[in-house]
């Protein structure tokens, strides 16, 4: 049995998609990779990403322009609206999120309020704003860190309610929410959460989570409640059903569904890489998410983004040494962009790299653009000996054929590698 390891560098984009400026015109200039390399204040040491072909996909003076390794390198469009970690990972694993509903909470206040009251909760508007206060302290609101209308949050102070209570409220919201994700968030803040409410883009209103202190005060608890999906038609479940061991690492352990998977949740990059390396020593599928790049993007901290990228690169060097059997695969990609120089703290809608190390291949292949992150999951399925048709979405590169379970994204391009 072979090993396939997918490493998702959260927020690592390689240039704006054509529709990146629909919400914020300035986002057409987004280029997370290039701007981190340009503005980090020093030359970043990224030998593994260079060997994996990042410089072929995104030419830059700071990246190697050739590689001796048998890699396939390209980039992928996101394949879902907006720029969101949850939607990105679900799409990557084979879900079709292309028609996910984008909606502000203001458009569904009556439905959400009625559901919460029916569940026995006290519900009020906060000073007439389109935001709900539940049981006097828990806020149901637009998520201000993603593109408007992609996600809603249910946020509470752990000084006021247990996380189980906050999560229960979020589950009730999820029953009527049309959006991709309802996120239950519990943390510690020194003042009532109403003190940190602000307006966001496109008339959204919500908790300013970074300002609340949730991220810096410790004890943060988060659970993502996604739109209803057939998880049996996603890569982790497909692999597990075939008897292939599955390990989910970092944020992937929190947002992907697979009852049989070993879960290794972690935020520190050193822990994510250690768990990934440990799991990669055994046959099976490993999906790992490095979250700290995304956090640096939200903080608009270019230097921190570069530091984390170097940490990731060091881990990738170890994985390249480890995954040396003919059918092993290391796939490095992203889920969206998060350009720390763009002038705001939101994700950016960018292409992401798709860098595949395949020890059995004869040389380097430059891949055409994939139309969706679902193609990454379909390609990983093929490398594990699985039929990508078992996924709900995605086009796999494969030997002498292309397997499509959704629209063909490559406009008849020949298969780029065996």
Q: Language-model features: where?
A:
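Feature captures the catalytic ectodomains and active-site-proximal regions of enzymes
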Residues: 1-418
């Amino acid at each position: 049995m072979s090993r396939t390891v997918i490493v998702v560098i959260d927020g690592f984009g390689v240039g704006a998609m054509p529709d990146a400026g629909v919400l914020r015109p300035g986002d057409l200039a987004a280029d997370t990779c290039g701007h981190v390399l340009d503005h980090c204040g020093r030359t970043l040491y990224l030998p593994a990403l260079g060997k994996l072909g990042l410089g072929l996909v995104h030419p830059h003076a700071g990246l190697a322009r050739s590689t001796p390794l048998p890699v396939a390198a390209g980039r992928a469009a996101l394949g879902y609206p907006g720029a969101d970690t949850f939607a990105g990972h679900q799409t990557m694993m084979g879900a079709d999120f292309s028609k996910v509903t984008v909606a502000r909470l203001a458009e569904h206040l009556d439905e959400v309020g009625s559901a919460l009251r029916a569940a026995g909760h006290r519900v009020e508007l906060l000073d007439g704003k389109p935001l709900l206060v539940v049981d006097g302290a828990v806020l149901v609101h637009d998520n201000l860190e993603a593109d408007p209308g992609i996600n809603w949050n249910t946020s509470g102070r752990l000084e006021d309610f247990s996380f189980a209570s906050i999560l229960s409220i979020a589950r009730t919201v999820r029953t009527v929410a049309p959006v991709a994700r309802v996120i239950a968030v519990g943390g510690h803040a020194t003042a009532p959460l109403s003190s940190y409410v602000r307006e966001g883009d496109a008339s959204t209103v919500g908790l300013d989570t970074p300002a609340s202190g949730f991220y810096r005060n410790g004890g943060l608890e988060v659970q993502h409640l996604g739109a209803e999906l057939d998880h049996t038609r996603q890569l982790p479940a497909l692999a597990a059903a075939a008897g292939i061991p599955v390990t989910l690492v970092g944020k992937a352990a929190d947002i992907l569904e697979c009852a049989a998977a070993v879960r290794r949740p972690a935020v520190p990059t050193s822990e994510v890489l250690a768990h990934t390396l440990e799991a990669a020593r055994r046959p099976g599928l490993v999906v790992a998410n490095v979250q700290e790049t995304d956090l640096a993007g939200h903080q608009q901290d270019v230097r921190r983004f570069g530091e984390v990228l170097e940490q990731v690169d060091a881990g990738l060097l170890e994985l390249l040494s480890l995954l040396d059997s003919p059918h092993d695969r290391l796939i490095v990609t992203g889920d969206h962009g998060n350009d720390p120089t763009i002038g705001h703290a939101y994700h950016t809608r960018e292409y992401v790299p798709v860098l595949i190390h395949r020890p059995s291949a004869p040389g380097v292949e430059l891949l055409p653009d994939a139309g969706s992150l679902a193609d990454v999951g379909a390609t990983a399925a093929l490398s594990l000996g699985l039929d990508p048709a078992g996924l709900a979405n995605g086009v796999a590169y494969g030997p002498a054929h292309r397997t499509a379970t959704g629209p063909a994204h490559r406009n008849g391009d020949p298969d780029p590698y065996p």
